[in-house]
Amino acid sequence: MSQTPNNLATYIWSLADLLRGDFKQSQYGRVILPFTLLRRLEGVLEESKETVLAEYTKIQAMNLPEEAQEKMLLRTTNNLSFFNVSKMDLSKLGEAGIKDNLESYIQGFSKDAREIFEYFKFAEFIGQLNDADLLYKIVQKVRRTDLSPKAISNHDMGLVFEELIRRFAEGSNETAGEHFTPRDIVRL
């Protein structure tokens, strides 16, 4: 598959095939968009992950408030505005305990990134996916998609998000022009 933004969006949107029957069409975007964002964030953080984890171990021993820890950790992220302190990634979640592992992984993100997942009510959908025995399947498909900056530029990734949001809006029966990229996603 050629990784043009449209082809990539089509591939990502094919997650909807797994959701059919267990989720309403209007809910597909509430699952697909945060998983896409999660995979992109994971790819962006790949280069600084080990440095952040090493620094986090040192900072934890200081018993500082979360805000102070975040300020210190942001210095180790290669000028990124977010980080993740979990040793997990999508490839390490495993099938047993995947719900708890994924929730823990998301809690490892810095506050601003976590707020985006909260906006999507992602924890609720993780539970529903787990109850429907779809969580592992979705994670496996998402993790096979390379959304790192080496594979797809920030501009093209923006186009992918726009296309996914457009499809989500169509599935939600919204009228044209009512969908947009949340500013938090653009800023990240």
Where do the model's predicted regions map?
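Non-catalytic, mostly N-terminal accessory regions of nucleic-acid modification and defense proteins
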Residues: 1-188
